[in-house]
Amino acid sequence: MNIAVLPNSPDTAPQIADPLDHLADKLFHSMGSDGVYARTALYESIVERLAALITSHREAGTEALRFPPVMSRAQLEKSGYLKSFPNLLGCVCGLHGTEREINAAVSRFDAGGDWTTSLSPADLVLSPAACYPVYPIAASRGPLPKGGLRFDVAADCFRREPSKHLDRLQSFRMREYVCIGTPDDVSDFRERWMVRAQAIARDLGLTFRVDYASDPFFGRVGQMKAVSQKQQQLKFELLIPLRSEEQPTACMSFNYHREHFGTTWGIQDANGEPAHTGCVAFGMDRLAVAMFHTHGTDLSAWPAKVRDILGLQPHVAAGAHGEGWR
C-alpha cells in the first residue's frame, strides 16, 4: 500500500529566508505583530531625507496637508472603499457602554474571558491611503478654479495584510501629490509626475521599471475591476526588483480615478462638470527598505551622488549603527 508523505505542518516546516530578512535587525524591532514594527534611528533618518527630497520637487501652487492616522468612517464609506477593499479595512472600536457594562468587560478579561465581545465600532477608521480625506475638504470649497487644485498630503496608513515581508507592512507611511480638475489637468499632472518620479528613482541609484497595474480589488467582481483598470491604463507603478524581476515591489504609483471622487463628493471643475482626480503615491517605507537593500546599511558606503542628494554628511565620529550621519 502506498503511504502519502505529508508536508511539514506550518509549525514545523522550515522557514524560507526572504531576501530582505538581512535588514530586519538593523532597521526594525518586533512589536509582537507581523508588519508592525518599531523603527530605528538609522531607518528613520532615511525616511525623513526621502520625504525632504520629495518635498523639494513639490510644484508651485500645491497646498500641503498632513492627516492623522484615522479618518471619518462615514467619509470612507461614502468614498466607496468598502465596495472595493473591505478585507483591508481596519476599524477603530471601543468600550462604549455604561460604567456597569464596561466594568463587566474588564471583569471578563481578569477572569480570562473574551472582553472583546463588548467592543463596538467608533465613528473612525484607520486611514488606508493618504488621499481619502482631501476630497471632502476640496468639495467644501465650492467649484474649482481654472487649472484645478493640487495637494501634497501624507499620513500614517493601515491595511490589514499581515506579512513577515519587510516590504509589506500593515502600518506604513504614504506621501501623495493629488490633482483635482479637468481630465486634461489630471492627465498632464500624472504625465509630469511619472517623468519626475523616475528621475528621482534614478538619482537614488535604484533599479526599476514602470508598468501598468491594478489595485487589489476584493472578490470575483474585484477581478473584473482589475482587468478594466489595466485595460484603461488608469494605474501605473514604479516597480523595484527587491526579490526578483518576476516579483518586483511597487514603491510608487500613478493613479487616475476619472470622475469617481468628483461625482461622489459633488466637486465641480471650472466648466461645471464633475471634477476628475489623480494622484502620485510614494510608499515611504518601501522606498526606505529599497534604499537599504540596494546600498546597504552602512551609510558611509553609499554612492557619493546618493549621499549628496539626500544631504548625508559624515559626522566626525560616525556611530556603529550609522547614527553619526545626519
Swiss-Prot record:
The keyword NADP does not apply. Catalyzes the ATP-dependent activation of L-glycine and its transfer to the phosphopantetheine prosthetic group covalently attached to the vicinal carrier protein bsr0959 of yet unknown function. May participate in nonribosomal peptide synthesis or related processes. L-alanine is a poor substrate whereas L-serine or D-amino acids are not substrates for ATP-dependent activation. Does not display tRNA aminoacylation activity. Lacks the N-terminal tRNA-binding domain compared to class-II aminoacyl-tRNA synthetases. GO terms for molecular function: aminoacyl-tRNA ligase activity; ATP binding; metal ion binding. It catalyses: an L-alpha-amino acid + holo-[ACP] + ATP = an L-alpha-aminoacyl-[ACP] + AMP + diphosphate. An L-alpha-amino acid binds at residue 176. The keyword Oxidoreductase does not apply. It is an enzyme of class 6 (ligase). ATP binds at residues 159, 161, 168-169, 235, 250-253, 286. Pfam families: tRNA-synt_2b. Belongs to the class-II aminoacyl-tRNA synthetase family. Amino acid--[acyl-carrier-protein] ligase subfamily. Coiled coil: none annotated. Binds 1 Zn(2+) ion per subunit. It comes from Bradyrhizobium diazoefficiens (strain JCM 10833 / BCRC 13528 / IAM 13628 / NBRC 14792 / USDA 110). This is Amino acid--[acyl-carrier-protein] ligase 1. Gene3D superfamilies: Bira Bifunctional Protein, Domain 2. Keywords: ATP-binding, Ligase, Metal-binding, Nucleotide-binding, Zinc. One of its GO terms (biological process) is tRNA aminoacylation for protein translation. InterPro entries: aa-tRNA-synt_IIb (IPR002314), aa-tRNA-synth_II/BPL/LPL (IPR045864). Homodimer. Zn(2+) binds at residues 131, 176, 279. Its cofactor is Zn(2+). Its EC number is 6.2.1.n2.
